[in-house]
Amino acid sequence: MIEITEEFGLNAGRVWRTLNSCGPLTEIQLIEETGLREKEIYAAIGWLARENKITRDNGLYRLDETNLNTEIGEDAGKIWQILSTEGELDTIHISRLIHRDERSIFSALGWLAREKKIQLKRTK
């Protein structure tokens, strides 16, 4: 069984390979080309942003130095602060606390997973 953090990294590799072979793609195209679900794409984007490998311009993602540090990095910082004080929380609770949508939460979790700052558990 693969742990979720490892899964995020594998999915990030899948997104990277897809962008490397196909060029710039929208989120919908990334989902179609990779076969990943939305949450998995968002976490992979966060992981790649932390690695400074992905950028988004006019709704298209491509491989390049990231321009997502402010957006994803700030959300990751907020989540890190909350988890440091509150302990274990689910994504719905985190979303309510920082007033961000699911896309933002999963991107930030991908960022934090790449930094090895969090442990994720899959719920049923």
Predicted regions and their residues:
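Short loop/turn and capping residues at structural boundaries
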Residues: L30, Y42, N58-L60, I94, ...
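Short amphipathic alpha-helical interaction segments
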Residues: L36-W47, R100-W111
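Long, charge-rich, low-complexity alpha-helical segments
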Residues: L97-I98, K121
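Short amphipathic alpha-helical interface segments
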Residues: E7-E33, I72-L97
